[in-house]
């Protein structure tokens, strides 16, 4: 879904009118938060956020997986597979599955680490452990009560923050903020900005670490676009962040096309993008997540060959602190189990 503009405006009349509905939704969500889920038998690290929409969870999961591997762990991801038709549990195979089967984010992650898609997250534990998981990375699911979380890392965009801080549908929050804060073990703030400073202060007051991170563009992706004028398009939680990132790298973005998160690109979309690019001699560029959806759609796979990917990774300002936090947290879980 595309984020409504009023989610960022506390003064919006429509947002205020929806507050009673949000209160009901929030009461149900808060009750779900208090439930205890299945114990996995191995440490479960949840990477989530307080609100609907994108904040950088997938790059965070990939970065954590790399760190965990360097610590000698075997991480396996469990994802709901948003946007996919398969309920699972099923191991994602990039050579066999399409985004329509398992979702674009699991498909992208499965190119570098084992990913289990399971609509019921607890059902994904057995296949994850069968793959040798010593640690489970739960992609999203902070508000889902079916699988017990041992360590919860919340990701927030430093510039966008939490919008108007009202509960869905009056705002982007998935549940009331206080019970979410109380269940947060660490906060990851992606990018510059002060929109989450008060949240950071609250987490620090509870003794949790606040980890700053930044999106780092792949040098080869940037080099391939130098000297070219591009038409950038994206169907992610915050397309504007993608466009800003391109410009920050010196890429000449002549045109932008923003789509809703997880947008299923159609032949009509592809034709319009091709026409616009050809008209002005522009190179098409998109995110790795969007390209995963394009490549695995047999009707438009040929179009994907002409699109340049813009790959990014997440780098933590203090990776040593993160490594210590993960090692201590995992060791504590194992002592208790």
From Swiss-Prot:
ATP binds at residues 51-58. Keywords: ATP-binding, Kinase, Lipid A biosynthesis, Lipid biosynthesis, Lipid metabolism, Nucleotide-binding, Transferase. One of its GO terms (biological process) is lipopolysaccharide core region biosynthetic process. GO terms for cellular component: plasma membrane. It catalyses: a lipid A disaccharide + ATP = a lipid IVA + ADP + H(+). Pfam families: LpxK. Its EC number is 2.7.1.130. Pathway: Glycolipid biosynthesis; lipid IV(A) biosynthesis; lipid IV(A) from (3R)-3-hydroxytetradecanoyl-[acyl-carrier-protein] and UDP-N-acetyl-alpha-D-glucosamine: step 6/6. Signal peptide: none annotated. One of its GO terms (molecular function) is tetraacyldisaccharide 4'-kinase activity. It is an enzyme of class 2 (transferase). Belongs to the LpxK family. Transfers the gamma-phosphate of ATP to the 4'-position of a tetraacyldisaccharide 1-phosphate intermediate (termed DS-1-P) to form tetraacyldisaccharide 1,4'-bis-phosphate (lipid IVA). This is Tetraacyldisaccharide 4'-kinase. It comes from Nitrobacter winogradskyi (strain ATCC 25391 / DSM 10237 / CIP 104748 / NCIMB 11846 / Nb-255).
């Amino acid at each position: 879904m595309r984020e409504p503009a009023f989610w960022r405006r506390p003064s919006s009349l429509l947002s205020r009118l929806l507050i009673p509905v949000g209160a009901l939704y929030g009461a149900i969500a808060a009750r779900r938060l208090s439930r205890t889920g299945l114990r996995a038998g191995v440490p479960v690290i949840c990477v989530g956020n307080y609100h609907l929409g994108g904040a950088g969870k997938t790059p965070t999961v990939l970065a954590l997986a790399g760190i965990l591997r360097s610590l000698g762990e075997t991480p396996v991801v469990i994802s709901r597979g948003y946007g996919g038709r398969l309920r699972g549990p099923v191991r994602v195979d990039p050579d066999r599955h399409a985004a329509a089967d398992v979702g674009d984010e699991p498909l992208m992650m499965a190119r570098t680490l084992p990913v289990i898609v399971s609509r019921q997250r607890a059902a994904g534990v057995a296949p994850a452990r069968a793959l040798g998981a010593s640690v489970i990375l739960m992609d999203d699911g902070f508000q889902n009560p079916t699988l017990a979380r041992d360590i919860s890392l919340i990701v927030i965009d430093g510039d966008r923050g939490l919008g108007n801080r009202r509960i869905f549908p009056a705002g982007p929050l998935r549940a009331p903020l206080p019970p979410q804060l109380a269940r947060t073990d660490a906060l990851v703030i992606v990018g510059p900005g002060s929109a989450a400073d008060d949240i950071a202060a609250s987490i620090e007051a509870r003794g949790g670490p606040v980890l700053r991170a930044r999106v780092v563009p792949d040098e080869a992706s940037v080099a391939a676009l130098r000297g070219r004028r591009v038409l950038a398009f994206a169907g992610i939680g915050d397309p504007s962040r993608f466009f800003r990132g391109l410009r920050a790298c010196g890429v000449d973005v002549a045109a932008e096309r923003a789509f809703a998160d997880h947008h299923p690109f159609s032949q009509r979309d592809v034709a319009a993008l091709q026409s616009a690019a050809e008209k002005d001699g522009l190179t098409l560029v998109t995110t790795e997540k969007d390209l995963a959806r394009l490549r695995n759609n047999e009707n438009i796979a040929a179009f994907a060959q002409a699109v340049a990917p813009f790959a990014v990774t997440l780098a933590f300002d203090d990776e040593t602190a993160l490594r210590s936090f993960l090692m201590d947290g995992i060791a504590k879980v194992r002592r208790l189990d």
